[in-house]
């Protein structure tokens, strides 16, 4: 019964934030902070007391650490079916942690309609948790689409204009909504197609994940349905050429919106590939894998090159996310257990490091009232602590040994090399470009000639706690990743078996 509460807690907390605004602007902030702290606490309890050696695998009835199922719309085979395994647990822990940080980083930034802001923030996070737990495909789609509306309001009502003043927050919010809504509708068509094909074969109308895993699909039909899922996840990840909504959304979003977008919402797409696209359509995924990995490779370099050209610090970080998610895509489709686990570590590490960089850019904006790096420079001695901490996270983002980013990228490249050596070698050179745009960001913002001589306010206790906590977690993930690898091992083993057997069949057919 605890699984429904993981979803309900953010929704209830959001309503309480909205209702609590009549008693002052401070109460909604504390309610939101307690709500996300409770979610994180329950996640840690489940991690400490759960058996995460159970996970779905081909040829066996899916087994889960925790499962909850009740009938919802019986006539159409729709149920409220939730389940938890190692992968979904790690994603929920990331959601809880970044949820706490998104509340803290908006503590002073958001001054208008504070209750409604936190209602939207909590409902985004509730929808994300629903995505990570839902096994009924209709329920999964419901939560997938439900995240969009509160994120639209978050950007449209509390966002900023672009640094050059040409793009408004309404433009960015609308572009985000259209991209993700259109791709979601494509996935809905694919879900309905899968359900109908299974119904024609078995005579059973169901949206249940376990039943649809057994669906017998003609090769051409499987490929088309897989593409429907892939496009939806590729837009959210994002994969080039479906990425253009991301820089605008990040640049115009409030800091909390950027933290949730980069840290959590992008990970729902990678999770969707691992949970649904590969296991439901293994043969089509194996056939499509070279194309997917090539798209990942393009994303690594395209994101890096566009990051070079940015003057808005948040747009630079956004394009770096496109580059980092290219490594995740290669790891997912490589068919290697090592690379798959590396993709999970990279998802966690990128969530932490990107969230920290967006929090730091938000703190810069509060002091300078600009995100344009051409108007910065010479800040190293003008702001206490912030430049040095920014340098650490920039180094972590480029894969500094001893941080989780290094472990994730190393495992992806080592695991992929045995299967796709030419893609891996080219992707490795992308790390060089990653170091260049990270150092460009630091040089433009903190070094060079100072634009003014005034000393700016240093970081206060709240700001230091947020980023130092993320730094410690990144180092723990880099120095001792074994607990995270053990937690996700069973799930990734199952995904590897689905994809590996499909690769074997594809090779023998040729």
Labelled PLM ranges:
Residues 49-79, 164-178, 184-243, 273, ...:
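Juxtamembrane/interfacial segments at transmembrane-helix boundaries in multi-pass membrane proteins
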Residues 1-2, 16-119, 206, 211:
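Transmembrane helix-loop-helix hairpins at membrane boundaries of multipass inner-membrane proteins
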Residues 240, 354-357, 423-457:
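Predominantly late transmembrane helices and immediately cytosolic-facing juxtamembrane segments
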């Amino acid at each position: 019964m605890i699984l429904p509460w993981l979803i309900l807690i953010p929704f209830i907390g959001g309503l309480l934030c909205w209702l609590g605004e009549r008693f002052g602007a401070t109460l909604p902030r504390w309610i939101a902070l307690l709500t996300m702290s409770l979610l994180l606490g329950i996640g840690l309890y489940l991690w400490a007391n759960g058996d995460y050696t159970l996970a779905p695998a081909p040829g066996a009835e899916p087994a889960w650490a925790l499962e909850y199922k009740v009938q919802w719309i019986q006539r159409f085979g729709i149920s409220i079916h939730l389940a938890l395994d190692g992968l979904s647990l790690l994603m929920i822990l990331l959601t809880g942690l970044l949820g706490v940080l998104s509340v803290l980083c908006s503590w002073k930034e958001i001054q208008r309609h504070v209750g409604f802001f936190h209602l939207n923030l909590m409902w985004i996070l509730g929808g994300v948790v629903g995505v990570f737990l839902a096994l009924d495909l209709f329920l999964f789609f419901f939560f997938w689409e439900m995240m969009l509306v509160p994120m639209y309001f978050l950007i449209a009502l509390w966002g900023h204009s672009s640094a050059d003043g040409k793009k408004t927050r309404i433009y960015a919010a609308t572009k985000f909504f259209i991209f993700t809504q259109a791709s979601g509708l494509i996935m809905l068509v694919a879900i309905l197609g899968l359900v109908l094909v299974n119904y024609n074969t078995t005579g059973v109308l169901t949206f249940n994940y376990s039943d649809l895993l057994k669906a017998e699909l003609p090769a051409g039909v499987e490929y088309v349905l897989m593409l429907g899922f892939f496009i939806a996840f590729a837009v959210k990840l994002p994969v080039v050429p479906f990425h253009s909504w991301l820089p605008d959304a990040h640049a115009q979003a409030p800091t909390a919106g950027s933290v949730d977008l980069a840290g959590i919402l992008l990970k729902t797409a990678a999770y969707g590939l691992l949970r649904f696209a590969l296991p439901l359509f293994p043969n089509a995924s194996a056939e499509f894998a070279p194309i997917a990995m090539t798209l990942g490779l393009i994303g690594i370099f395209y994101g890096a090159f566009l990051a070079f050209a940015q003057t808005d610090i948040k747009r630079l970080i956004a394009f770096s996310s496109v580059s980092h998610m290219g490594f995740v895509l290669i790891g997912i489709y490589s068919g290697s257990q090592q690379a798959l686990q590396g993709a999970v570590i990279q998802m966690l590490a990128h969530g932490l490091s990107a969230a920290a960089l967006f929090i730091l850019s938000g703190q810069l904006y509060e002091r300078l009232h600009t995100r344009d790096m051409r108007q910065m420079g010479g800040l190293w001695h003008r702001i206490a602590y912030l430049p040095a901490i920014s340098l650490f996270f920039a180094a972590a983002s480029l894969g500094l040994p001893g941080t989780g980013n290094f472990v994730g990228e190393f495992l992806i490249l080592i695991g992929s090399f045995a299967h796709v050596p030419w893609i891996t070698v080219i992707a490795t050179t992308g790390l060089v470009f990653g170091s260049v745009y990270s150092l460009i960001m630091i040089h433009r913002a903190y070094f060079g000639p100072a634009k003014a001589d005034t000393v700016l306010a240093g970081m206060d206790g709240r700001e230091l706690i947020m980023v130092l906590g993320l730094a410690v977690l990144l180092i723990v993930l880099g120095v001792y990743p074994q607990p995270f690898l053990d937690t996700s091992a069973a799930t990734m083993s199952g995904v590897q078996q689905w994809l590996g057997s499909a690769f074997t069949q594809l090779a023998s057919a040729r």
